[in-house]
Amino acid sequence: MNVYLLLASGILCALMTVFWKYRRFQRNTGEMSSNSTALALVRPSSTGLINSNTDNNLSVYDLSRDILNNFPHSIAMQKRILVNLTTVENKLVELEHILVSKGFRSASAHRKST
């Protein structure tokens, strides 16, 4: 009987942990999506209908301006991202150079041995 009680309490604890983490994950993603207005690609018209003749789509300029107004720290973040991307690009070029040079060396060594 104690084994069944221990098993049931273990299952209950596991389910409570999963439920708690699931609720916390939903709350975090819900807050992000409700606060993020920069990803809205279509402006609602006054009638609620979208005409193809009217300009309801945000342009890149409007979207960039909206992002800068809502997230003033985004310029610094974009600069850091560009620096990181440049670093990654340089590392990939170095890796490609190393792999190509090793590939040629092993190919030339393989040809000499045969």
Curated annotation (Swiss-Prot):
Subcellular location: Cell membrane
Matches recorded under InterPro entries: KKLCAg1
Regions of this protein lying in the Extracellular compartment: 23-114
Keywords carried by this UniProt record: Cell membrane, Glycoprotein, Membrane, Signal-anchor, Transmembrane, Transmembrane helix
Cytoplasmic topology ranges: 1-4
Record's bilayer topology term: Single-pass type II membrane protein
Keyword Membrane: yes
Pfam families linked: KKLCAg1
Coiled coil: none
Endoplasmic reticulum in keyword set: no
Residues the record marks as carrying a glycan: 84
Origin: domain of life: Eukaryota
Gene Ontology CC, one term: plasma membrane
Chief subcellular location: membrane
Residue spans crossing the bilayer: 5-22
Full protein name: Kita-kyushu lung cancer antigen 1 homolog
Originating organism: Macaca fascicularis
